[in-house]
């Protein structure tokens, strides 16, 4: 009578929400130079929109300085424009095929704005984790209704799903706390 319920798919989907959150948080400016800061920048190149890292090498030159080595000399202008138009508040200095980007210190107001954005990303990740939990609970209810599992199994699996959900929500909170600390650090 007992069909087995596999929680590994739910864990994989919840892990995907955490990975997305970490990727989004990595793109938030903290006042320190990191190559991931320019990940959201796309350049209009060769008739299409390409990620910056597909037309240039991004490296950290100093604690507050990024260096962007453009591979094609004709792409320097479009790369410069893409970085300026990216809403990151960055202004590159062009030196031949290299763009130097000084990362200005964040003022208090900008730090608070970044923290709010980080909170928004974290809340979206929590919602995604809860959606996965709901899908798992719905699957359990369907299995119970179809008499594929008993009530005891349904309750046991529901408790297991809740435990995993709590674990992943905790991971979201940890990632948010670490990013907030990094953002607020002067």
From Swiss-Prot:
CDD domains (UniProt xref): RRF (cd00520)
GO BP, one annotated term: cytoplasmic translational termination
Molecular-function annotations in GO: ribosomal large subunit binding
InterPro entries linked: Ribosome_recyc_fac, Ribosome_recyc_fac_dom, RRF_sf
A family per Pfam: RRF
Gene3D superfamilies recorded: 3.30.1360.40, Ribosome-recycling factor
Domain of life per record: Bacteria
GO cellular component: cytosol
Record's keyword annotation contains Protein biosynthesis: yes
Localization of this protein: Cytoplasm
PANTHER family recorded: MITOCHONDRIAL RIBOSOME RECYCLING FACTOR PSEUDO 1, RIBOSOME RECYCLING FACTOR
Purpose of the protein: Responsible for the release of ribosomes from messenger RNA at the termination of protein biosynthesis. May increase the efficiency of translation by recycling ribosomes from one round of translation to another.
HAMAP family, sorted: RRF
NCBIfam families tied to this protein: frr (TIGR00496)
The family this protein is said to belong to: Belongs to the RRF family.
Entry protein name: Ribosome-recycling factor
Organism: Beijerinckia indica subsp. indica (strain ATCC 9039 / DSM 1715 / NCIMB 8712)
């Amino acid at each position: 009578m007992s069909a087995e319920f596999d929680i590994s798919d739910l864990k994989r989907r919840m892990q995907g929400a955490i990975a997305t959150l970490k990727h989004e948080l990595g793109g938030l400016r903290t006042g320190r130079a990191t190559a991931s800061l320019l990940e959201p920048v796309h350049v209009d190149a060769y008739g299409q929109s390409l990620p910056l890292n597909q037309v240039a090498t991004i490296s950290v030159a100093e604690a507050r300085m990024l260096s962007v080595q453009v591979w094609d000399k004709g792409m320097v202008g479009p790369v410069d424009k893409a970085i300026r138009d990216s809403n990151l508040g960055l202004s590159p200095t062009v030196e031949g095929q290299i763009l130097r980007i000084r990362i200005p210190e964040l003022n208090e107001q900008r730090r608070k704005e970044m923290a709010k954005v980080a909170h928004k990303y974290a809340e979206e990740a929590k919602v995604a984790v809860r959606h996965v939990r709901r899908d798992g609970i719905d699957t359990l209810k369907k299995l119970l209704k179809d008499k594929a599992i008993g009530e005891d199994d349904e309750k046991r699996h529901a408790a297991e799903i809740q435990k995993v959900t709590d674990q992943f929500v905790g991971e979201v909170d940890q990632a948010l706390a670490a990013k907030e600390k990094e953002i607020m650090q002067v």
